[in-house]
Amino acid sequence: GLWETIKNFGKTFTLNILDYTK
């Protein structure tokens, strides 16, 4: 559903930011 998509996007976005700031 839409909520799962939003949550997954948030998770990947956060992980990408954390990975980028290493």
Swiss-Prot record:
Tissues of expression: Expressed by the skin glands.
Q: Which GO terms describe its biological process?
A: defense response to bacterium; innate immune response
Q: Which keywords accompany this UniProt record?
A: Amphibian defense peptide, Antibiotic, Antimicrobial, Immunity, Innate immunity, Secreted
Organism superkingdom: Eukaryota
What cellular component terms from Gene Ontology apply here? extracellular region
Instruction: Indicate where this protein is primarily found.
Output: secreted
From the Swiss-Prot or TrEMBL record, state where the protein is found: Secreted
Hydrolase as UniProt keyword:
no
- Function of the protein: Has antibacterial activity.
Q: Which family does it belong to?
A: Belongs to the frog skin active peptide (FSAP) family. Brevinin subfamily.
What is the official name of this protein in its record?
Brevinin-2LTa
Q: Which organism is it from?
A: Rana latastei (Italian agile frog)
